[in-house]
A protein has these predicted regions:
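Positively charged n-region of N-terminal signal peptides that target proteins for export
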Residues: 1-4
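C-terminal motif of bacterial Sec signal peptides marking the signal peptidase cleavage site
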Residues: 15-19
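Bacterial signal peptide processing site
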Residues: 21-24
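Short, compositionally biased low-complexity segments enriched in polar/charged residues
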Residues: 48-85, 96, 100, 127-130
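Second-shell loop/turn segments in exported
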Residues: 76, 86-94, 138-143
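Short, conserved charged micro-motifs
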Residues: 95-103, 148-152
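Short Gly/Thr-rich strand-loop-strand
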Residues: 98-135
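A short, solvent-exposed beta-edge/loop patch
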Residues: 122-155
Length: 155
């Protein structure tokens, strides 16, 4: 009986420690990731590439407390105006900067919902289902028409 109790307590301890391990965040988002989303059929139209210098004010990253030097690289594709679809991958100098940027992207998405509620109401579900995913010091912003196609790449 004593051995059984020790075994059960050991198993419980092992399970507790495994639970503390946290969720694996996966590999960093890259330009290859971005291209995979573009090729996935998740968008209802062909998206146009935005200049990286446009992304800084568009996403209001400075308002989030970031400096331009903290953004290592950025690449984004966006609808020319017919839809609210877009995909962006941003890479920062550290995880804290990426956390701040994730908050800025949440604010950006909320502002897009407000701005498009009466103008393009059919786009609101896409914006409400927008994905902002941080992996280390990289971020993905995804506003897609086909969430199922996009979900396959988010795994």
């Amino acid at each position: 009986m004593k051995k059984w109790i020790i075994f059960c307590l050991s198993a419980l301890l092992a399970l507790s420690l495994a639970a503390c391990g946290g969720k694996e965040t996966g590999a960093a988002w890259t330009e290859d990731s971005l291209q995979a989303f573009l090729d996935s059929g998740a968008f209802s139209e062909e998206l146009e590439e935005l200049d990286a210098d446009i992304l800084w004010p568009l996403y209001r990253l400075e308002d989030a407390g970031l400096s331009r030097e903290q953004l290592d690289s950025a690449r984004a594709f966006r609808s020319a105006g017919a839809t609210c679809e877009e995909v962006a991958v941003l890479s920062f100098t550290d995880e804290k900067a990426a956390e701040l940027a994730a908050d800025a992207l949440k604010d950006y998405t909320a502002a897009q919902i407000d701005a498009n509620r009466s103008y393009r109401p059919d786009e609101i579900p896409k914006l409400e289902n927008a994905r902002i995913d941080r992996r280390g010091s990289t971020l993905l912003l995804l506003v897609a028409a086909d969430q199922d196609a996009a979900a396959q790449l988010l795994k």
